[in-house]
Amino acid sequence: MLHIERFQCNMLSENCYVVSDETKECVIIDCGAFYPEERKAITDYITGNNFNPIHLLVTHGHLDHNFGNDTIYQAFGLKPEVAQADEHLMKNLQHQAESFYQMKIDTVFPPIGHFFEDGETIHFGNHELSIIPTPGHSKGSVTFYCEAEGVAFTGDTLFQNSIGRTDFQ
């Protein structure tokens, strides 16, 4: 059975998920942790539960879903995995900070570790996540779907009580 721990992060209340099962393997989805206490809460949760994080998954390349990638890389050696259509966004996270948030950040983001392939499935523990392309919010937006549990991680493709925004492409 999946265990899903949600962390609300940064000034936009972005959702980061640590998804684990009984094997203690876990994946981190959309680590948008900006503030030090958010970063600490996520890493403490993973280490405190003796989890073995094996993937840092990204639904899309907007900064609010990637603020904390450097922390995950430093703590666990994981590089972000993303759709290639969002490569440009991922390589320009500092620019997003300046243009969207009017802030200058000196974060050194880890390089992209893997681009998703068409039809790829992410395996961890006793579970798997299908990668479903859902372009619209960004060209490379994806949804991670666990069919066995009936759970989807949609990033900003869907908002609570609404559809996601599609005007950022």
Stretch-by-stretch model annotation:
Residues 16, 38, 68, 91, ...:
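Short, function-defining helix-loop hinge/capping sites that tune catalysis or transport
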Residues 19, 30, 60, 72, ...:
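Divalent metal-coordination and catalytic microenvironments
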Residues 2, 51, 125-127:
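Structured loop/turn residues at beta-strand edges in well-structured enzyme cores
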Residues 12-13, 109, 125, 138:
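Short, basic and Ser/Thr-rich N-terminal targeting/leader segments
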Residues 7-8, 111-113, 133-135:
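Short Gly/Pro-enriched turn/cap motifs at secondary-structure boundaries
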Residues 33-34, 96-97, 121, 127-169:
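Metallo-beta-lactamase
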Residues 1-49, 143-155:
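Conserved beta-strand hairpin/beta-sheet module of binuclear metal-dependent hydrolase folds
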Residues 33-39, 43-123:
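Active-site HxH/HxHxD metal-binding segment of metal-dependent hydrolases
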